Regions:
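Short helices/loops that flank or line small-molecule/ion binding pockets
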Residues: 34, 59, 63, 80-94, ...
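Hinge/capping helix and adjacent helix->loop/strand transition within the periplasmic-binding protein
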Residues: 1-81, 141-173
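Well-formed, non-transmembrane alpha-helical positions, independent of function
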Residues: 29, 84-85, 100, 127, ...
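Conserved functional loop/turn residues at catalytic and ligand-binding sites
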Residues: 26, 90, 132
Length: 214
């Protein structure tokens, strides 16, 4: 409430990825390995426990019938470092945003995303839902203004953001990252934020075991 919501712009679905040489071909393989030996599967993320990276993986394990509070989650201080941890073998899976790994597909295999159906910009990437794990989750990006921002300025910026999404330059960036446009200005954005807040609060019980990497 200390800022003024202007508009939401994009959504980035969650993704679970493994190294190209991983024996895991899908999320069912990961779940089977975890249930056989929980210590054999460590999950990397580019932010702390309770963050979007953590929640994506934790929700997937919960839907699979595993206790997400016992899954070892290793938080790195950036997405690039989390990817490096996966590729080095320090972790077996990476929980992140789809946009984060689209540019690394020569090194990783994306084995599940949190979209309700496959996305057109990555048609070969399966959803978790189609594998039997109904996890649907989108991490959004939006713009906010300072307290006291005038209604006129807010509308002007919101319109500009909407116009940007109609340009070929924006479409190229969106497609490269497999983002989805969720342009929702002003009151629509406020309503969206209220819904997202309720959903996020409902996930606070997920506390995967955390191992810190320095």
């Amino acid at each position: 409430k200390d800022v003024v919501p202007i508009a939401g712009v994009i959504g980035d679905y969650g993704a679970i990825a493994v190294a190209k040489n991983s024996p895991y071909k899908n999320f069912k393989d990961v779940v089977a390995a975890y249930k056989a030996n929980p210590k054999s599967v460590k999950m990397a993320g580019g932010s702390v426990r309770g963050s979007m990276d953590h929640l994506i993986g934790a929700l997937a394990f919960q839907e699979a019938g595993a206790d997400p509070n016992k899954v070892v989650y290793i938080p790195y201080d950036a997405g690039g470092k989390a990817l490096a941890g996966l590729l080095s073998g320090e972790t077996q899976i990476l929980s992140t945003g789809l946009g984060e790994v689209m540019g690394a597909r020569d090194q990783v295999r994306i084995i599940g995303i949190t979209a309700p159906k496959r996305v057109s910009d990555a048609p070969d990437v399966p959803t978790l839902k189609e594998q039997g794990f109904d996890v649907q989750f989108v991490n959004w990006r939006g713009f906010f203004g300072p307290p006291g921002m005038s209604s006129g300025d807010k509308k002007k910026i919101a319109k500009m953001l909407g116009d940007v999404q109609k340009t070929p330059e924006w479409e190229a960036v969106r497609k490269r990252n497999a983002w989805v446009n969720i342009y929702n200005p002003d009151k629509k954005f406020v309503k969206f934020l209220q819904t997202q807040t309720k959903e996020t609060v409902s996930y606070t019980h997920l506390r995967a075991h955390e191992t810190t990497v320095y």
